[in-house]
Amino acid sequence: MKIEKLMALYGENGALLEELYNQYKLNPETLDKEWKSFFQEVDTNGLANGSGYTNGNGKSAVATSFTDAQAASIREMGIINLLNAYRRQGHLAAKLDPLGIQKPNRTFIDSKLHNISPADIDTVVDSETLGRVKLAEIVDLYEKVYCNTIGAEHFYLVNDEEREWLQKKMESPEFLAPLPRGIKLRLFEKLFQADYFETFLAKKYVGKKRFSLEGGESFIPLLDTIVEEAGYHQMDGLVIGMAHRGRLNVLVNIIEKPASLIFAEFEEKTDKDNLSYADVKYHLGYSNSRMTTSGKEVKLSLAFNPSHLECVDPVVTGSVRARQTLIGDKDRSKYMPILIHGDAAFAGQGVVAETLNLMNLEGYTTGGTFHIVVNNQIGFTTLPDESRSTLYATDLAKGFQIPIIHVNGDDPEAVYRVVKLGMEYRQKFKKDFIIDLVCYRRLGHNETDEPAFTQPKMYAIIKNHPPTVKLYEKRLVEEGDIPQEDIDFIKNGSMHGLEDSFQRAKEQDVKIRVDTMQGVWSKFSKDSLDSEPATKLLAEQMHGIVQALTSVPQGFTPNSKLVKLLQSRKEMAEGKIPVDWGFAEALSFGSILESGFRIRLSGQDSQRGTFSHRHAVLVDTNTNEKYIPLNHISSKQAKAEIINSSLSEFSVLGFEYGYSLSDPNALVMWEAQFGDFANSAQVIFDQFISSSEVKWQRLSGLIMLLPHGYEGQGPEHSSARLERFLQLCALDNMQVCNLTTAAQYFHLLRRQMLRNYRKPLVIVTPKSLLRFPASLSPVEDILQGAFREILIDDSGSKPDKIEKVVFSAGKVYYDLMKYKDENKIKNVALVRVEQIYPFPAKEIQSSLKTFKNAKQFVWCQEEPKNQGAWFFVRERIEELLPGNARLVYAGRHESPSPAAGHMKLHLQEQDQLVLDAFQA
């Protein structure tokens, strides 16, 4: 019998039971089988017919006629329900809020709710952890575990092993055992360091923004415990992503960045060689190695990040994935990401869910991220009931089957316990784990803000609430095993250390210096963009690559159409037919792998390719087995990962960017399904990819493939918003290309890896050109050619006969060429700008000297006038034109929408812009 129906036997539910029993006597078939079976048992046990009698207490005669065994069974179920209520809903009764504003709710663990009488509390039961004991002892244990300063949410986990493991750990005597004296002293030391650091900054730099951690100081011992546990678990490194609040504290007290450097940043003592070091101090990252008490050195990296909350999340996880790959960490136990969230941001920012969704995906898993929500119960001036629709800020994570432990920030020992639990869980199950550190914000959003304007009651409470370090000091002294002298020794050491660092920053030549070109980056340059390595492919090298790319293992059955594709690629390599874009890419990939560079390409449908042009991963039609020809070229090659991503742009691009930061020897590529959708990841483009070098001196060789081209598919499938990327271009920060031939694509990919520096590369890739005959390339262009930043086509015209030069980029060139050929125009030269940035001024100037008699100059583009490359190239090209010549525009009119939604209108516009180019 289901517990819900058995509960009906008690008290006020007797009337319902009576009604059901009468219904059973009249027509048993009208009841479900469980009730029918139950009443059959009742009749068998001798319950009298005519069940309307009640006993002296007013209870149903049915309810009073059960055997002792049945009553015992019901009592047992009540006990089970009560204990499971502690496990399931004990967090609601926990004392989590240091301020006492959020009151515990004990409704669900009320013994009366589960029909447990005072006498039942003395029932002897079997316990896995306590043995055969009275129920009262188990309830007492559960009160301490689930309803004190720790609130556990784990009962929703569908994996029985995970759920039971967590319960067993938390309910074991070891979980609540008194902490060793050394651990208590360390917790106090880190708490005091956190508290005093903020106090010190407040005194020395009055009114300066530092985004204080005050009210959440337990965050520092929490992080310190993670580092110590990482050493215990023999981890090699941790990568941390966090926003600005408490960041300076973390840099000094966790990463162990010299405090003198922090003070130098307040003093703005920037090294003259680092004038481009252009970001505020609470956005900066740092890396260091820390020796843990277990004797294991752990590398710590705090990621640089902007003020855009949570956008660093996928960047950190991507960086960790790369580090795991570099050291061969296949079980993902050596490197771990740590993400620090705010309560409002965790619930409010969509990238959090996007990043959580990557947790178990084969191409993105890191073996579990350790999440800490620094829950100060406010977002700037916004309270929780204004910023989320859930009880907890962390409720989102339940859908991803992630355990969540809430803990009161005023209990550092509870914080320590849940960190140890979380680290063990992560290492065992290779899954994310979340600690919700419930604390408060003692000051306003920043040090100049007045929080009492908007939260007067909360800040009246905060004003009178002692700091956590004071509470813990009092607790330690009262417990008696740590004398005041030991506590004072810790205090004095921390205070003197900060004062010494401050004086050094004031009096000595402490300069802010940044050197991100270390480790795997040490062989790369930050300066030269003139490097043009040979990118041609030797014939003998190509032979082995082609053999691998066009073969499948014995017994593997690809789709019949793909058999034809593989055969056609053989013919391309033999020179019988031109090389298409898909095969040009495959050849470049193969040659890059043979050179020892890893390849990682991810995006929506990237294994096949949105336009069915790639087919880098073949699928057996009989078994669904996958085969990647790129990984079977030679025994010495590097590995290729071709990944179908989740349906996300923001998190996946952020992940790949993070990956590229940690592995410059990998060709890392992100492909948008259509370039139009890239703006879903605009924060990553703006805050990281385009600006990380000038802000943080962080380099990246990430390639972004953004399908682009006007083909009548409407405003959402035509434009990668080329103009937006060009607007971001300055100081040689990245490369933007719009290619017109398969060979150009081949050489550009190889150039990206063979250069001795790394810059992001945006390629607005073709769609219809993928198979357009004129854009395909003879194999000789791959064997002998090189990437050319501009391509000139004068169709055999004599240079001195050229009167007009039409510049363009991308697919529109072929429309121009068609018109020129059809109309036998000989006095117009077409110049394709294949690399728009860095702008190829020298090459264009050289071409103009060739056409010395040209008087008219046109820029032709498919995009509307306010979009595309027009506003970017106009001044740059005009500066190169002879005399007072001006550059004339030919293209679509200005429009807020990228493209027309009807094919007829599209064709009219396309014909007109081509006509304008020749008649302008």
Swiss-Prot record:
One of its GO terms (cellular component) is cytosol. Its EC number is 1.2.4.2. Pfam families: 2-oxogl_dehyd_N, E1_dh, OxoGdeHyase_C, Transket_pyr. The keyword Signal does not apply. It catalyses: N(6)-[(R)-lipoyl]-L-lysyl-[protein] + 2-oxoglutarate + H(+) = N(6)-[(R)-S(8)-succinyldihydrolipoyl]-L-lysyl-[protein] + CO2. Keywords: Glycolysis, Oxidoreductase, Thiamine pyrophosphate. The keyword Oxidoreductase applies. GO terms for molecular function: oxoglutarate dehydrogenase (succinyl-transferring) activity; thiamine pyrophosphate binding. Belongs to the alpha-ketoglutarate dehydrogenase family. Homodimer. Part of the 2-oxoglutarate dehydrogenase (OGDH) complex composed of E1 (2-oxoglutarate dehydrogenase), E2 (dihydrolipoamide succinyltransferase) and E3 (dihydrolipoamide dehydrogenase); the complex contains multiple copies of the three enzymatic components (E1, E2 and E3). This is 2-oxoglutarate dehydrogenase E1 component. It comes from Leptospira interrogans serogroup Icterohaemorrhagiae serovar Lai (strain 56601). The gene is sucA.
